[in-house]
Structures are given as structure tokens and as C-alpha cells.
Amino acid sequence: MQLLISDANILIDLEEGGLLRQLFGLPYEFRVPDILFYEELEDQHGYLVDLGLGLGELDEKGMRAAFEYTRKYNGPSRNDCFALALARQERCPLLTGDKALRKAAEREAILVNGTLW
């Protein structure tokens, strides 16, 4: 099953549209960085794990990459940079609707898609 790394905004947008069950019914595995989940999603969207959202951990090299991205790019948040680094670490596409994160992913040669693909 194809792994896709998501930022928080994609999941929140799909929740607002009432599309989360359909999302997790697709033949993909969805993950977010664990720190992003705990800081941005757990309190109000903790049930996402029950729907099938996975949590990904950055290894040492991935953490270094994430902090490098925070220094290198102005627009993406720290948690966005964790998602970017996790996509690189796992060698899989990144899902985001954030323009700054999309541009950073493109500069890092990481395949990036949006809500509507």
C-alpha cells in the first residue's frame, strides 16, 4: 500500500468537508509526524488514529533535515518541516495545501500533492 505523509491542514480540510471516512477508505496509508500529531491534532482530532492515521517518527538524520528546513525556508512552520522531512525519510509523497510547504517540497525534489491531488 502506498504511503502518503500529510500535513495537518489536509486532514482538517477533509474533516470540514465530511470526507475523512472516505479518505481512510482509499488504498493508501496516511501518516503524520508524531510531534505534529501531538502538537496540532491530538486535542481536537485524536480520533484520527482510530480511523487509520499512522504516526511516523523521524530518525536522527530526519530530525537534522527538519531543522535544516526550518532554517532554509521562511514560510513552512516547524511542524510542516517535520512532515517534509518524514516524506523524504520514507521516500514517499507529501500531501499539503500550504503554498510555502509545497514550494519547499518541490525545491527538495519531494513529490507533493494537494487535497484534490
PLM feature segments, named:
Residues 102:
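Active-site-adjacent loops and short helices of periplasmic peptidoglycan-processing enzymes
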